[in-house]
């Protein structure tokens, strides 16, 4: 029986990465992830299969700027609308991408550590989370081709030089099916020469390489 959060996390990572990560590296990885999440290794894991919502819950899904009111920050306007007009009728608020972005209505993230200034601040996000259960689109599968991490990939610098999936010419993509007309692999100029990067959605959305433990920790 898994009694601690660290044990459960270790089990999940071992199931995904198998022999690709040594036991010692796996233990260090678990510690890094728990520290990053500010969680205790001895903390009990959440109950399995516990529903976080039921038929009585009502969720609002919205972009950060779906509601505008003069010069007020859109996230403040959203909070005011929810608390004054909807109140306790709503239990969940799902905010679509609110980070700085370059394309695809927020789904090509430039910087995960900040809130788009055109929408508001982290305080506005926190305020929503105080009054409602908060959900957000973190967009963890890819980031903007103009992000600092991808610029570092091009320059061969850290962090970022090994954050992106860059298959070689022998990689078989013949079984990949995707509802897109843009190329799956895009060639980019780097310090090491031209390299192909995996772009599931668009050339501006470059996929992360989660085979690299550093990406998961980041």
Report each predicted region and the residues it spans.
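Acidic/aromatic-lined carbohydrate-recognition and catalytic surfaces
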Residues: 2-217
